[in-house]
Amino acid sequence: MEELRERVWHGSLNVEIMLSDSIVVPNTPLSEKCYHIVVLRESFLALYLPAIVRKLGNNVIVTYENPYKQWWFEYDGVPVPWEYPCGVLFDFLCNSSTTSTGKEDDQRLQMWKLKLCHGNKYPPGILPLVDGLRQVKDHWKHQWKQACFILNGSAKRIMSLSIPDFEAFWQSLISRHQPDYIKVREKLLTPNKTKHIPIRVWTADASFLQPSIPANSDTMTLFDVMTSMDIKLQENNRAIIQGIVICSDEDIINLYDLFASIDGFLYVVIK
């Protein structure tokens, strides 16, 4: 179990960032308008913006204030929100996955091709990044407040964390130090007293659902959760968690324990 958690924590994606045609300097060589980077599934795209803009920023025709404000990503012409973990976005937008038996396809080799865009007007669905890293941190804390409320019936646990504990929690994401992350995360959970499971479901038709799933009932499987939302899992309609196709008879509490993301939610992508 610990090995699986560690694999989830260190899971990564190969990403190609290409400057949007609308902002790139004409006749820029491909090598200077394209950047290949490895991002962690359990991270946020916004955290990579400074490095990306530093690499590509000299080849744009726009004037920009900083590496966060008025920048966004697109995939196949669709704006990509920064506020969800990278792995969740990849699972929803791309087709690659790993079976629950461990047999892998080309996920590790597949390149996630994103366009880097800039403009005064954000496209619909994009949360403006006006306060840089602080905004990412505040958003992440707000997500954990929601998750704690669902788990415990109150956000008191995260709100009562000491400043050093909360800073250690945040820095564990930046420094990728899993033991520090787990140490603080355990303070936010109440084993055997969980009220509901923080779960978010992205359906094949792009609907985003957040069902109320009680944790104190008899064993509830992924199939039960999907059935409660009138979602049928079939060969051509699979549930993907952390890049893995999950069997429908898996216990939902165990899935949360193993695969909950860095913002406290278990994300299920239906494809």
Curated annotation (Swiss-Prot):
The keyword Ubl conjugation applies. Keywords: Autophagy, Isopeptide bond, Membrane, Protein transport, Transport, Ubl conjugation. GO terms for biological process: autophagy of mitochondrion; cellular response to nitrogen starvation; piecemeal microautophagy of the nucleus; protein transport. GO terms for molecular function: Atg8-family ligase activity. Conjugated to ATG12; which is essential for autophagy. It comes from the Eukaryota. There is a cross-link at residue 145 (Glycyl lysine isopeptide (Lys-Gly) (interchain with G-Cter in ATG12)). Its main location: membrane. Pfam families: ATG5_HBR (PF20637), ATG5_UblA (PF20638), ATG5_UblB (PF04106). InterPro entries: Atg5, ATG5_HBR, Atg5_HR, ATG5_UblA, Atg5_UblA_dom_sf, ATG5_UblB. Gene3D superfamilies: 3.10.20.620, Autophagy protein Apg5, helix rich domain, Phosphatidylinositol 3-kinase Catalytic Subunit, Chain A, domain 1. It is found in: Preautophagosomal structure membrane. It is a peripheral membrane protein. One of its GO terms (cellular component) is mitochondria-associated endoplasmic reticulum membrane contact site. Involved in cytoplasm to vacuole transport (Cvt) and autophagic vesicle formation. Autophagy is essential for maintenance of amino acid levels and protein synthesis under nitrogen starvation. Required for selective autophagic degradation of the nucleus (nucleophagy). Also required for mitophagy, which eliminates defective or superfluous mitochondria in order to fulfill cellular energy requirements and prevent excess ROS production. Belongs to the ATG5 family. Conjugated with ATG12. This is Autophagy protein 5. The gene is ATG5.
